[in-house]
């Protein structure tokens, strides 16, 4: 029986560096800084749950007795996994209901709250419009508000992740209890990122792909579904391409029918990991790993801080945390080499599936020394549970060894998971701690202030919302932050400040000749036009005119703000001025002529008398531009009769040539 000493030692090191992350919660090691804004009660709950797991694992007979009772119930494996996944989904929903939504999901909720937003332009890499439609369909059925529906669908995404992982674990020969720990962690990460993004589906595709890979290697039959699922996963999220080396080795095995060699895979994987570690240390040494402990200034002077003990400790912390499971895998490889036996083909494939994503995780954003995008990091770190559970099944530990290793594994998994799915019942304290964390890491806190601003915006607290974006602009000149501040100043009728923010957005978008899809959304004037119409109804045309002018400043190439201004002038019955404005608009954009005619034709069919008068006046102005004097006379006659001889309409009618 092979010993688990290397495996236990590796996780002991991991527990040590995790403890470092807890003692220094401002360390931005992957996820642990979120512990800084969890309550003391939540941390006690973490410690109690970890102690309970450790106590149970020291008496395997208890676990064995419980497992025996469960085995007495005859259920199909797929049904059993589905029940476990649903139970996890209930837990995810409970956790989500008890925590404030301060992550990326808050921004998605902010967009879902806008019924006029483009469903194809949602936040995220490739968000499915069908999932947005699911949100809209669930709202009237469940009676939930947008955050409630969001929590429900996020929990469902966690269910999908857990179920897919359990199916893979069965293919890898891992017991459901051990697999469930990893599945819960995986689903919790999916829940934290908040929206039902395609990288959750990517994780499911990778799970099925690796399960089919293991099964087909054992049976000696090549499966075409493996490369097809690899392509699908990469289409869902490009981070999945890091799993392609394992797929390439599998395809090579399927074509040549030659077994994979342990030495070749071992040296390839080890060499790549050494290169990644080197890149990590070099970039962190010279620039400062700002994603980790931000204790040094950025720029050329950063090298003067490289010998600070906390700098060196933080580099080691991040490296061991990311590479710890790989070190365990290498220990297992050395243990296997002592017996002078080759690893099985599936074990080698999973080695490749572990090493390349971890290397990409370290080298993804090399000037930072570590992957900064957490959704990409989530996708790449999926390799860790794939290979770690596979390693566990390879060793086949004895009950005593399992009792010694399980507490370490469970504690590590809980500390990784709980910061993401969080148990936080006190929203006020959470907001205070979140703000505190942002101030500890000012150079990289712009996105955090963005999250907080979206949170306050949904709560209709405009002053807090504006403060968050002012703080965000101190650290990042993101044009979207300027846009949000412009909306705030418009709502306060602070026109000069709003104009300054609008000009900042426009200058950033048109700084070069290429306007990307993301920049197109920044100059979308629809929200400003809605605010203009609201001002027109509440306080008259003066404020509305200012908003429409700001909208024209935001996107000088758009015809929508001038059209909105002309339509407002029609409603004031200043038809001579409206005719001049429409003439200029049609000269610049001929398509607007048919749009205006269609709009006013729809108005004359409405039951409201005021809307019908507006429609006839608009049709008269358009007919005058087209040279249709008879049509203009007819439309104005209808408007005059409906308005009981309005003097402004009568004056415009009198000015028309007979």
Locations of regions flagged by a protein language model:
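Transmembrane signal-anchor helices characteristic of membrane glycosylation enzymes that use polyprenol
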Residues: 11-28, 42-57, 75-103, 115, ...
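Short acidic/glycine- and proline-prone juxtamembrane loop motifs at membrane-interface regions
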Residues: 103, 191-201
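Loop-to-helix entry region of an early transmembrane alpha helix in multi-pass inner-membrane enzymes
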Residues: 125, 140-163
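Transmembrane-helix signature of polytopic, membrane-embedded enzymes
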Residues: 165-186
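Membrane-interface alpha helices of multi-pass inner-membrane proteins
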Residues: 187-188, 192, 207, 222-238, ...
């Amino acid at each position: 029986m092979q010993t688990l000493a290397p495996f236990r030692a590796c996780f002991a090191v991991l527990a040590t560096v995790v403890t470092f992350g807890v003692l220094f919660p401002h360390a931005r090691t992957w996820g642990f800084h979120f512990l800084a804004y969890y309550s003391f009660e939540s941390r006690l709950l973490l410690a109690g749950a970890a102690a309970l797991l450790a106590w149970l694992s020291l008496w395997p007979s208890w676990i064995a007795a419980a497992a025996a009772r469960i085995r007495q119930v005859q259920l199909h494996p797929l049904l059993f996994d589905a029940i476990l996944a649903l139970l996890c989904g209930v837990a995810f929903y409970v956790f989500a209901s008890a925590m404030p939504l301060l992550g990326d999901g808050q921004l998605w909720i902010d967009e879902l709250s806008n019924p006029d937003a483009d469903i194809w332009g949602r936040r995220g890499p490739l968000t499915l419009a069908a999932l947005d439609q699911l949100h809209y369909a669930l709202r009237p059925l469940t009676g939930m508000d947008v955050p409630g529906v969001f929590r429900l669908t996020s929990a469902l995404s966690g269910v999908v992740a857990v179920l897919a992982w359990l199916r893979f674990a069965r293919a890898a020969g891992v017991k459901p209890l051990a697999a469930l720990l990893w599945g819960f962690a995986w689903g919790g990460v999916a829940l934290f990122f908040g929206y039902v993004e395609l990288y959750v589906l990517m994780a499911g595709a990778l799970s099925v792909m690796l399960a089919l890979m293991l099964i087909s290697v054992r049976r000696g039959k090549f499966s075409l579904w493996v490369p097809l699922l690899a392509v699908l996963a990469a289409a869902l999220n490009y981070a999945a391409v890091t799993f392609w080396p394992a797929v390439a080795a599998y395809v090579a095995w399927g074509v040549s029918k030659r077994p994979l060699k342990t030495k070749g895979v071992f040296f390839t994987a080890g060499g790549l990991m050494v290169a990644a570690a080197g890149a990590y240390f070099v970039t962190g040494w010279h620039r400062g790993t700002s994603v980790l402990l931000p204790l040094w200034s950025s720029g050329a002077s950063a090298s003067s801080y490289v010998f600070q003990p906390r700098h060196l400790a933080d580099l080691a912390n991040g490296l061991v945390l990311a590479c710890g499971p790989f070190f365990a895998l290498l220990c297992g490889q050395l243990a296997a080499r002592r017996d002078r036996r080759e690893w099985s083909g599936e074990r080698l494939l999973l080695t490749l599936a572990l090493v390349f994503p971890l290397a990409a995780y370290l080298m993804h954003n090399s000037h930072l020394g570590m992957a900064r995008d957490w959704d990409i990091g989530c996708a790449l770190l999926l390799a860790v549970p794939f290979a770690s559970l596979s390693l566990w099944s390879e060793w086949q530990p004895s009950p005593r060894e399992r009792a010694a290793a399980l507490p370490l594994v469970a504690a590590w998994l809980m500390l990784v998971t709980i910061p993401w799915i969080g148990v936080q019942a006190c929203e006020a304290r959470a907001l205070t701690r979140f703000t505190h964390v942002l101030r500890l890491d000012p150079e990289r806190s712009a996105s955090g202030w963005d999250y907080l601003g979206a949170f306050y915006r949904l709560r209709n607290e405009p002053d807090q919302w504006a403060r968050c974006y002012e703080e965000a602009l101190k650290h990042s000149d993101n044009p979207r932050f300027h846009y949000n501040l412009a909306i705030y100043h418009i709502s306060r009728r602070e026109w000069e400040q709003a104009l300054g923010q609008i000009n900042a957005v426009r200058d950033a978008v048109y700084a070069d000749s290429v306007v990307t899809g993301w920049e197109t959304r920044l100059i979308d004037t629809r929200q400003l036009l809605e605010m203009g119409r609201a001002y027109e109804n509440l306080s008259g045309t003066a404020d509305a005119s200012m908003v429409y002018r700001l909208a024209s400043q935001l996107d000088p190439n758009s015809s929508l703000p001038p059209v909105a201004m002309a339509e407002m002038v029609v409603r004031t019955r200043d038809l001579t001025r409206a005719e001049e404005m429409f003439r200029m608009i049609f000269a610049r954009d001929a398509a607007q002529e048919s749009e205006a005619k269609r709009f006013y034709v729809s108005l004359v069919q409405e039951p409201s008398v005021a809307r019908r008068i507006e429609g006839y006046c608009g049709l008269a102005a358009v007919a005058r531009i087209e040279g249709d004097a008879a049509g203009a006379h007819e439309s104005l006659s209808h408007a005059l009769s409906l308005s009981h001889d309005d003097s402004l309409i009568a004056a415009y009618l009198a000015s028309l040539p007979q």
